[in-house]
From Swiss-Prot:
It is a multi-pass membrane protein. It comes from Chlamydia abortus (strain DSM 27085 / S26/3) (Chlamydophila abortus). Composed of six subunits; NqrA, NqrB, NqrC, NqrD, NqrE and NqrF. NQR complex catalyzes the reduction of ubiquinone-1 to ubiquinol by two successive reactions, coupled with the transport of Na(+) ions from the cytoplasm to the periplasm. NqrA to NqrE are probably involved in the second step, the conversion of ubisemiquinone to ubiquinol. This is Na(+)-translocating NADH-quinone reductase subunit B. One of its GO terms (molecular function) is FMN binding.
């Protein structure tokens, strides 16, 4: 029956006035059955797997990230939008799988989470495929070429890079830009220089920055979430320093001014975590001994929040740490990121129980996809490994150089340089970009040496943008797009080196 339906479409398109729609019939036939034509442009597959099946393998690899995008967006919308401070406290203090499952089944409900998450993610997915597909069909009809299968991957990658609160018309505009400008204008699938999904996100990021950053990471109605957080903070008596918020790790990192030093963070951590030794302990104790002359009987690890703020913001001449009073909340927030306190714990970052773009939060889900892509030979493990090495080494060098240059274990170096290098791999969209974006076979290099250099370059630029550039909290998107631009050049020099070695 399906074959008869496809044949009937072919018969209709054979008529003169419908011949321009032949690419549509060909696309339907190719989607349902094996294509009858050979690939004329890259990527070329030298086995029985055609491009459609090859693209479907990438979609399968995205299943874990897609499921967790639905799950996390659902539970976060329910908790943050509940207006219940006790529910929020219970959610933020989950410490293991047993307590997490207990929270889900006793306080929220599994089906409520899935239903809420589907209402957030599925409309964006439908818009992505519908608008992107319409653009593909339009260009195929006008140019009289076949409709390629590239949209199968682009259509699901794109919504996974968006915040859940993005307006639908903006999502449609972004995918249209990605398909038309970054792909079709270059000749279609296999000819594009830039990753179409990332290009669409970059277009939205620079055109509508207020909708792509800030308090946009929970639910589908930012106003409702904001009112709910205000209600919860008022009920729990929270201040701006320790109150509930939508801040992400990278937003906290980006908003931390250079005047917040490592010694400020270490002093706060020693109080919160009751640590007996932090890297700058000697400098802190030296200052604290002077400060306690006017505040007798106080212990560093037993200060109240007001006393801690007084110590950290008092002038150096009085035994304080010299932080501006208006920047104490920034120092308090970055302490959670550096030391993995509360919602920014390493476990939450790895498993994905954090705020962020829909598909980027879970490093675990991305690793599952990476294993599948490497085993099937779809993605290059060289690009993944070199990307991770480049990011890790760059973050580690920032820390080491800060210690060597500033002295005293980097006490007076900017605090943002001391995030553990391994935690940089869990933050933001690094894992998602490493697995699914940087390994795009069309916009990434093809030579082995070029792949190593390409990955190292992207990892290096990601950390540079995160730590140095004050305008952009996340560097993965810009780093990958910049790497795409240099990919042909890297391949060119890699080929020259290979030829010289052969000679």
């Amino acid at each position: 029956m399906l074959k008869r339906f496809v044949n009937s479409i072919w018969e209709i398109c054979q008529k003169d006035k419908f011949q321009r729609f032949t690419p549509v019939a060909d696309a339907i036939d190719t989607f349902c059955y094996e294509p009858i034509h050979q690939a004329s442009s890259p990527p070329f597959i030298r086995d029985a797997v055609d491009i459609k099946r090859w693209m479907m393998l990438v979609v399968i690899a995205l299943f874990p990230a897609t499921f967790l995008a639905i799950w996390n967006s659902g539970i976060q919308a329910l908790v943050y939008g509940s207006g219940n401070a006790q529910l929020m406290e219970a959610f933020l203090h989950i410490s293991g799988f047993r307590s997490y499952l207990s929270f889900i089944f006793n306080d929220i409900g599994m089906f409520s989470v899935l239903w809420t998450g589907c209402k957030i993610f599925l409309p964006l997915l439908i818009i992505s495929y519908t608008v992107g597909g319409a653009c593909e069909v339009l260009f195929a009809v006008i140019r009289k070429h076949k409709i390629a299968e590239g949209l199968l991957v682009t259509g699901i990658l794109y919504p996974l890079t968006l915040p859940p609160t993005i307006p639908y018309w903006m999502a449609a505009l972004g995918i249209a830009f990605g398909v038309v400008v970054s792909k079709e204008l270059f000749g279609g699938t296999g000819m594009n220089i830039l990753n179409p999904a990332l290009s669409g996100r970059a277009f939205l990021f620079f055109t509508f920055p207020a909708k792509m950053s800030g308090d946009v990471w929970v639910g589908s109605n930012p106003t409702h979430i904001k009112d709910s957080l205000l209600t919860m903070n008022a009920t729990a008596g929270k201040s701006i320093i320790d109150g509930f918020s939508q801040s992400t790790c990278l937003q906290t990192l980006n908003s931390t001014p250079p005047s917040v030093k490592r010694i400020h963070v270490d002093a706060i951590a020693s109080n919160i975590l009751h640590m007996t030794h932090v890297p700058t302990q000697n400098v802190i104790e030296s200052q604290f001994s002077i400060w306690t002359e006017s505040h007798p009987g106080l212990l560093l690890d037993k200060l109240t929040l007001e006393q801690l703020q007084s110590f950290v913001t008092s002038p150096l001449s009085e035994g304080g740490l010299g932080l501006l009073p208006t920047q104490f909340d920034s120092a308090y927030a970055i302490t959670d990121v550096i030391y993995g306190i509360g919602k920014f714990s390493s476990g939450n970052l790895f498993w994905g129980n954090i705020l962020g773009s829909l598909g980027e939060t879970s490093t675990f889900a991305c690793l599952l996809g990476a294993v599948f892509l490497v085993i099937t030979g779809i993605a290059s493990w060289r690009t993944m490994v070199s990307f991770g090495i480049g990011a890790f080494v760059t973050a580690w060098l920032f820390k080491i150089c800060s210690i060597l240059i500033a002295g005293k274990h980097g006490a007076w170096a900017p605090a943002k340089f001391f995030i553990p290098a391994y935690r940089q791999l869990f933050l933001g969209g690094l894992a998602f970009g490493l697995v699914f974006m940087a390994t795009d076979p069309v916009s990434s290099p093809t030579m082995k040496l070029a792949k190593w250099i390409y990955g190292l370059f992207i990892g290096f630029m990601t950390i540079i943008i995160r730590l140095i550039n004050p305008a952009y909290p996340e560097g993965v998107m810009l780093a990958i797009l910049l790497g795409n631009v240099f990919a042909p050049l890297l391949d060119y020099f890699a080929v020259r080196k290979y030829r010289r070695r052969r000679i």
